[in-house]
Amino acid sequence: MPGGRRGPSRQQLSRSALPSLQTLVGGMCGNGTGLRNRNGSAIGLSAPPITALITPEPVRHCHIPELPVDGGLVFEFLFFIYLLVTLFTQYINIYKTVWWYPYNHPASCTSLNFHLIDYHLAAFITVMLARRLVWALISQASQVGTSSVVKYSALIIGRLVLLTLCGWIFCWTTVNLFRNHSVLNLLFLGYPFGVYVPLCCFHQDNRSQPLPTDCGYLVPDSLVHEGANGVGGLVRPKDFLSLLRESLREQFNSPPSIPSHSCPLSPDLIRNEVECLKSDFNRRIKEVLFNSLFSAYYVAFLPLCFVKSTQYYDMRWSCEHLIMVWINAFVMLSTQLLPPKYCDLLHRSASHLGKWQKLEHGSYSNAPQHVWSENTVWPQGVLVRHSRSLYKAVGSYNVAVPSEISHARFYFLFHRPLRLLNLLLVIEGSLVLYQLYSLLRAEKWNHTLSIALILFCNYYVLFKLLRDRIVLGRAYSYPLSSYGLKPH
């Protein structure tokens, strides 16, 4: 045998490696599972849980200032005025004339062909666009306290008169449209409602009862533990009439109140809060999409369906007008239903939720791995196994289910607090720049007038977005240590 220094044996090497491996990451988890070696087998070591050895970084929240937000009634009034302006410009695009020519050339001496306009259709569209404003007026009047019988009686009479007037105009215009137009044209009048009922009424995001405003903190503990395996315990089947009633009530109700956030410490409560906020956010987005498409449909598309076959209009410009109306209506409704305070609430919940990154098989084979536990708060960088896959903790505070795609999507959207605001700002800024470019290249008087009127409305929306972006950007960039906040 040649001489020389002999290294340690394989048994001695494995024995010396185990304590360092356990001390590095923390041994077994709180649910009785331990580390795993390269072959995937568990190493039975008695060690304290991982949260006792590696404390997750505490979650700190920024305090944002209270930014002014338009009230429900003020917003509905401004939104209704904007829709009326866009409806007026669409009628200009369709029924414009060359009124500056001498009288011996054209047969028209006015700027529009008023004799071709269907006033019953215009009144019908106006009533449909005013539905949210009328309901906001009634809701606002109902919330006002009345101390005398006379004021209360006047309030009831005013509500009845307003509803009767709107109902009479709606019925009168509908009857006249039935008399003067074909059945095919009349199908376009209620097309949005016909599409809304099957798409939205039967898809309620697995929820049957409205969740409390504090996102599940009033839910009993038994239901919280059942919700860890799925929120099916809170779901009860509904019939068609109940779904239809609830969906129509959502369309007419004022914007819902913003839920609260109390920085829960239990992983079950955090996941329950995320499920609640996810359902609330989906409902708000559904309302934004439907109302923006509804407004663009009745403002820019429905007048085109009732144009006579002998009437010429610029199809490309009318379609472009339709797209611009829809985009701006989408941004206006998003800024109202997704205010900065609500986006900050989603960001705080995402900070507590965390995220897991799925790794390929065979990677990090020498690193310690744990079995994921639903009752453990996992720090950043920890490797866990769940559903035969390997995941790495991305956030500083992780309680999300690794295989749950909705949790990863929620964290991606809201872990940066300005992501939604930046997206809306880019959309509105691009729209304004395109309208300015179109205004510079416009050669027809109706194009210039329509773009100028719509730009006047878009400037207000762009100003609000820029103001919120500048203020919130400064607030979120401020060091957290200067607030003197306690970690949650």
UniProtKB/Swiss-Prot annotation:
Q: Name one GO biological process term.
A: negative regulation of autophagosome assembly
What domain of life does the UniProt record list for this protein's source? Answer: Eukaryota
Keyword terms of this UniProt record: Glycoprotein, Membrane, Transmembrane, Transmembrane helix
- Topology term for the membrane: Multi-pass membrane protein
Renumbered to this chain, the signal peptide range is: none
Q: What residues form the membrane-spanning segments? A: 72-92, 110-130, 155-175, 182-202, 287-307, 319-339, 420-440, 446-466
For this UniProt entry, what is the primary localization, expressed as one broad class?
membrane
Quick check: keyword 4Fe-4S in the entry? no
**UniProt cross-references to Pfam families, sorted A to Z:** Tmp39
Gene Ontology cellular component list: endoplasmic reticulum membrane
Q: Where located?
A: Membrane
Which sites carry carbohydrate? N31, N39, N180, N206
Q: Which family does it belong to?
A: Belongs to the TMEM39 family.
Q: What is this protein called?
A: Transmembrane protein 39A-B
The primary gene name is tmem39a-b
